[in-house]
From Swiss-Prot:
Name this protein carries in UniProt: Oxidant-induced cell-cycle arrest protein 5
Organism: Candida glabrata (strain ATCC 2001 / BCRC 20586 / JCM 3761 / NBRC 0622 / NRRL Y-65 / CBS 138)
Record key words, sorted: Cytoplasm
GO cellular component: cytoplasm
Similarity comment: family membership: Belongs to the OCA5 family.
InterPro entries membership: Rab-GAP-TBC_dom, Rab-GAP_TBC_sf
C-alpha cells in the first residue's frame, strides 16, 4: 500500500471517528464514549463536550478517594504520619520531592482555618488567602512566560496590526488565569485538609484549559468565538518578530469542525470549569485505601507473617509509592541497557531537583512534562476507564467504596451493529490471556495476589478452558469490553514505552540532555495532530505534508529501499500515539508473563 493511500484511509477513519463520537454524544451513550476514549482517543475538536460526559459518570468521581499530601501511610508501623506542614519542601510518600527547589514555589500550602496561635482572627485568614492566591498566580503565569517576553512589544504595535478582531488578547489571558486560579481555590476549599496546594494543581488546571475553554458560558453558539483554549506554547520558540504570539487560540481554528457537525453538538455546558477541574483531579490523583487493603490482606492471609509482600496491586492499582516502584522494576526488566546508564546519569536521590520529572510523570499524570497533544490522549485513557459494571468488580478497584452505582452503566453499546463498532470492538491494548475470564472481586479473587496465583495455576497446569475463546467472541459481539487494569497502572507501561521508543537517543545523550528529555518529552503523536488539524482539508494537502516529511528521512539510494524496516524504536516514523499504546500493551504482557514465569519457577 502506498503511503498516500495509507494516509487517505487514515483521514477517512478519523472523519468517521468524529461523526461516530458526535452520534454517541447525541445519544448520551457514555459507556461507548468511554470505550472510544480509552482505546482510540477522543478527537481534539470534541474533548470539550466529551470529557464532561465521561467525568459525570466516572467511578472515581462518583466514589472518590484521592492521595494525600498532608499525611503519609507507613506500612511498617501500620499507621499514618502527618507531613511537616512548615517545611519549605514536602517529600511525598514515594520518597522524592513533590516540588523541586527549581520551581521557586511554596509547595504544600494549605488554606488556613485558624492561625498557628489558635487565633480566629479574620485578618490572619485573609492574609493567608492573599498569600496563597499570589503563589497560585505565580505558578500559573509560568505557562505564559513566552508571551510575557513580547507582550509589551505586541501592545505597542497593536494599533498597526492587521490581526483579526477575534484574535486572542492579553486581556483574554488574564481572564483565563483568573478562572484557573478560582478553580484551584474552590478545589482547595473542599479538599485542603487532605490535599494542600502544590504547583501540580496549577499545571493540571492549565492542562484542562488546553482542551476545555475556561471561559465557556452556560449557553453558547458553537459558531461564536468563545472557545478559547491554551495552545501549549509555553516555550519561546517563535521569533521575536511574531508580536501577536499568545498562549491561547480558538479551538475550532486550530482543529476545524464542519458547521453541520457543530450543529449536532449540545449548546449548553454540563459543568463549569471549576466543577470539571475538581472531577478531573478526583481521577488523576485518585488512590486506593492502602491501609484498608493491607488490613484485608492481613485478615485473609493470617498464616502469612509477611503479609506486606502480598500487597501487589498491579491490576487494581496501587498508591503513588507502589506505582513508582513498579515503574523502576519494569524499566530495569524491559530496558536493562538503558536503565543502568540513566540511573547513573540522573541522580535519583531523595530531595534532588533532578527527580522532579517523577513528580510530573506520576503524581500529575504528565502535566508540564508531556506535550499537550500526548497528555490529552493519556487523559482520554484515564477518563474513559471503566471496570465491568457490577458491584463486586467496582469494589475490587475502589476498595473503599460503599456506594451502589453499577446501574449507571450498560454492557451493550447503543449502536452495536454499526460498521464502526464492529471494526474496533476488540481494541483493548492492555488485554492479558485469561485475565478477562476471571471474575475480579468475587471470592477468592478479591486481591491481586490471588488473581496472579490463578493465572499461575492456569499456566502451570494448562487449564485454559477450550471454549473460552468462543465465549469471549460471542460476548464481545454483544457487549462492551471493559477495562481490566487500573489506568494508573497503564500509565506506567506507557512511560516505559516512551523510553523504549527513544532508547537509542537516550543512550547517546549527555546528562543535561537526559534531564531535559525527562522534563520535556518531545511530541509523540505528530501524525495524529497533523491529521486532526487538516481533517477536513480538500485535496492532497495532508498527504503532501506527510509524504514530504517521510521522504526527507529516507536513504538517498533507491537500492536501499528494501532496508526500510523497523530496526529500532527510533526507526519508526509514524509518530502515532496508537503505535505507542500498542507498544505499551506489549510491554505489559511481556513483563507480567516474566513475573508469572519467575513465580512458577520458584514454586516447589
Amino acid at each position: 500500500m502506498s503511503k498516500s493511500l495509507k494516509h487517505i484511509k487514515q483521514q477517512c477513519r478519523d472523519r468517521e471517528l468524529v461523526q461516530e463520537v458526535i452520534e454517541l454524544v447525541r445519544r448520551n451513550d457514555h459507556d461507548s464514549l468511554a470505550y472510544v476514549a480509552r482505546t482510540l482517543g477522543i478527537p481534539p475538536q470534541l474533548r470539550f463536550v466529551v470529557w464532561p460526559i465521561l467525568l459525570k459518570y466516572h467511578p472515581m468521581c462518583i466514589s472518590p478517594n484521592i492521595m494525600s499530601n498532608t499525611v503519609v501511610w507507613d506500612p511498617l508501623t501500620s499507621s499514618y504520619h502527618l507531613t511537616n506542614a512548615d517545611a519549605a519542601q514536602d517529600v511525598n510518600s514515594s520518597g522524592y520531592v513533590a516540588n523541586g527547589a527549581a520551581n521557586g514555589s511554596a509547595n504544600g500550602y494549605e488554606i488556613s482555618k485558624t492561625s498557628t496561635n489558635s487565633s480566629t482572627s479574620d485578618d490572619v485568614v485573609n492574609e493567608d488567602m492573599v498569600h496563597l492566591e499570589k503563589i497560585i498566580l505565580k505558578d500559573l503565569r509560568k505557562y505564559f512566560h513566552s508571551r510575557a517576553t513580547s507582550s509589551s512589544q505586541a501592545v505597542s504595535s497593536s494599533s498597526s496590526s492587521t490581526a483579526e478582531p477575534s484574535s486572542p488578547t492579553v486581556s483574554d489571558e488574564c481572564e483565563i488565569i483568573d478562572s484557573l486560579k478560582n478553580a484551584i481555590l474552590r478545589f482547595l476549599s473542599k479538599w485542603s485538609r487532605i490535599f494542600k496546594y502544590e504547583i501540580g494543581l496549577a499545571w493540571l488546571a492549565l492542562g484542562l484549559a488546553e482542551w476545555f475553554p475556561a471561559l465557556l458560558p452556560a449557553k453558547f453558539d458553537l459558531n461564536d468565538e468563545c472557545f478559547l483554549v491554551l495552545n501549549g506554547r509555553r516555550h519561546a520558540h517563535t521569533s521575536s518578530g511574531n508580536n501577536n504570539s499568545t498562549s491561547i487560540s480558538q479551538l475550532f481554528q486550530e482543529y476545524p469542525l464542519l458547521d453541520y457537525l457543530k450543529n449536532k453538538l449540545p449548546s449548553e455546558r454540563l459543568f463549569t470549569f471549576d466543577q470539571l477541574y475538581e472531577r478531573l483531579l478526583l481521577v488523576l490523583i485518585h488512590s486506593p485505601d492502602t491501609a484498608l487493603e493491607q488490613n484485608k490482606i492481613k485478615r485473609d492471609f493470617p498464616q502469612d507473617s509477611t503479609h506486606i509482600s502480598n500487597y501487589f496491586p498491579v491490576i487494581s492499582g496501587g498508591d503513588l509509592s507502589f506505582r513508582t516502584q513498579i515503574f523502576f522494576k519494569v524499566f530495569s526488566t524491559i530496558l536493562p541497557e538503558l536503565y543502568q546508564p540513566l540511573i547513573e546519569e540522573v541522580n535519583l536521590q531523595p530531595n534532588s531537583s533532578r527527580t522532579s520529572w517523577l513528580y510530573w510523570w506520576f503524581k500529575c499524570a504528565g502535566a508540564r512534562s508531556l506535550q499537550r497533544q500526548d497528555r490529552g490522549r493519556i487523559w482520554d485513557l484515564f477518563l474513559g476507564w471503566r471496570p465491568k459494571p457490577d458491584h463486586v468488580t467496582i469494589n475490587f478497584y475502589l476498595n473503599y467504596n460503599t456506594k451502589s452505582f453499577a446501574h449507571l452503566y450498560h454492557k451493550s453499546p447503543s449502536i452495536c451493529h454499526s460498521k464502526f463498532w464492529n471494526k474496533y470492538e476488540k481494541n483493548d491494548t492492555f488485554w492479558f490471556p485469561d485475565l478477562d475470564s476471571i471474575p475480579l472481586g468475587t471470592p477468592p479473587y478479591t486481591h491481586d495476589v490471588t488473581i496472579i496465583k490463578e493465572l499461575l495455576r492456569r499456566n502451570k497446569y494448562e487449564e485454559r478452558a477450550s471454549d473460552s475463546n468462543d465465549t469471549d467472541q460471542e460476548c464481545c459481539m454483544n457487549s462492551i469490553p471493559f477495562s481490566i487494569i487500573s489506568p494508573h497502572t497503564q500509565l506506567i507501561f506507557i512511560y516505559v514505552a516512551i523510553l523504549q521508543f527513544n532508547e537509542f537517543k537516550l543512550l547517546e545523550f549527555e546528562e543535561t540532555e537526559i534531564a531535559e528529555f525527562l522534563n520535556n518529552v518531545p511530541m509523540l503523536s505528530k501524525a495524529d495532530d497533523t491529521a486532526f488539524k487538516k481533517l477536513f482539508d480538500t485535496g492532497s494537502t495532508l498527504d503532501n505534508v506527510v509524504l514530504h516529511d517521510e521522504a526527507s528521512k529516507r536513504p538517498s539510494s533507491s537500492s536501499n529501499n528494501h532496508m526500510l524496516i523497523e530496526v529500532g524504536s527510533d526507526g519508526k516514523s509514524s509518530h502515532s500515539f496508537n503505535d505507542l499504546m500498542k507498544m505499551a500493551g506489549d510491554i505489559w504482557r511481556k513483563w507480567l508473563w516474566r513475573e508469572l514465569e519467575e513465580n512458577l519457577n520458584n514454586e516447589p
